[in-house]
Structures are given as structure tokens and as C-alpha cells.
Amino acid sequence: MLPTIGGEHASRILFLIIEFFDVAEEGENKNVRGLSYIAENSNDTIAVGTTDSIAIPLNTNRNTTKYQFIRNTNNPNIRNADTIEFIYEVNEVYVNRACGFKAVYKDLSAIRSIETPASNNWIRSVSIEKLNVENEQNTHVNIDH
């Protein structure tokens, strides 16, 4: 494979790294069965499968991205969708002459939509682990379920 001009940052969007945890066992990763997600105003559902972490893109043209996270996607009897809106500032950071600039996200926050009754939500809490999304080596958001 040929190297890319600009190295690892060329033609690349930084992804938000999310880990899923067991709400009953603090600090214990917990798989989400049949996970998929869809961005607001999109018709493309991304099927992930069973996992305890995902990487999702944030919109660089706006300061907010809203996703619907769906568990048990393939079972209509127990399918459950929750919505989280991520809010941030988009800043451009100079990488080098070959690559130019890349987008980083600052002051990340999240708003979880609460259903009525709240027990209908499969996502119990969302916590921001890194306020700034500058790389993909660290988890940025924890979701307890």
C-alpha cells in the first residue's frame, strides 16, 4: 500500500470513541446486543452488531450531531432506540504543509433524550471522559446501560 500524502491525518475525520458500561457494575464494560446507529436526517442505519465500544463521526459543518442508538436491532419485539445529541466547537488545527488542517472538537457535551417513563430508556447515563476530541487513542464518552 502506498503512503498517503499528509500521513495518518490525510482525508480523515476524527471519530468520537464511545465505550459501553454495565450500569450495575461500575467500571465493567458491557456489550450492547444488536447495536446499530443512525444520524439525524440520515436514511443510513449503521449496523455494528454486539460490541462494547464504537467510533462514530461528528459533523464538521455544525456544532452538534444527533444520533439514535438502537439495541436489539433485529428483534422488533425488544428493539429499543435512544437519542443522544453531542454538542461541541469545531476548530481547525494545522497538521503540516502536505496535509494542511484537520478538524478537532472542543468542549464536548452530550444530552440524552429521556422517554416517558424513563425506564423505557436502555441508555441510563452518558458521561464525557475527554472534553476535547483531538485523537482516537482515548475513549471520549462512556455510556452506562
Model feature map: region roles:
Residues M1-A55:
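Long, hydrophobic N-terminal alpha-helical segment
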Residues M1-A10, P57-H145:
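Extracytoplasmic cysteine-anchoring/structural motifs
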